[in-house]
Amino acid sequence: MSSHPDTPSQCVLIVDDDVSVTDTFSRMLRLEGYEVWAALSADEGLSLAQTHQPHAIILDLRMPLTSGLQFLRAIRAIPLLTNTPVAIVTGDYYLDEAHAAEIQALGAQLRYKPLWLEELVGLARDLLGGDPVD
């Protein structure tokens, strides 16, 4: 947990259609001192991202209506969010090479579920370049 209570925490946006994933990831990151916003759809996530301009985004690849890859393309087209660090998290171990290559070309990390506490916190630190404070 952060030892700087007066320093604003870094904001992470979690986008996943599985409420148990968003709840678990949110709780785990909040315990580490991050501010967390959560969305249950890509459309809701895009709205939150534009409103709150998170420091990093962790999102699911497979979501109904708008996929994580479509979300990533949209984020990269928004000037204020173009350089936001993004990680796509998926349980799809047989991801097609073209999709994996596009994710990499769009500057996002690709990780596989399940993510345990240490892995999730490590991912957040990696995306944000360090501790959960500015």
Regions found by a protein language model. Name each.
Residues 8-20, 25-29, 57:
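Conserved acidic segment of CheY-like receiver
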Residues 19-37, 105-108:
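Two-component/phosphorelay signaling modules centered on CheY-like receiver
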Residues 63:
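Receiver (REC) domain active-site loop signature in two-component systems and cognate sites
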Residues 89-91:
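Hydrophobic/aromatic residues positioned on beta-strands within the core alpha/beta folds
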Residues 60:
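Active-site residues of response regulator receiver
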Residues 70, 93-112, 118, 122:
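Alpha4 helix (beta4-alpha4-beta5 surface) of REC/receiver domains from two-component response regulators
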Residues 38-47, 68:
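Helix N-cap/capping motif at the beta->alpha junctions
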Residues 1-11, 116-134:
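Non-catalytic signal-transmission and effector/linker regions of two-component phosphorelay proteins
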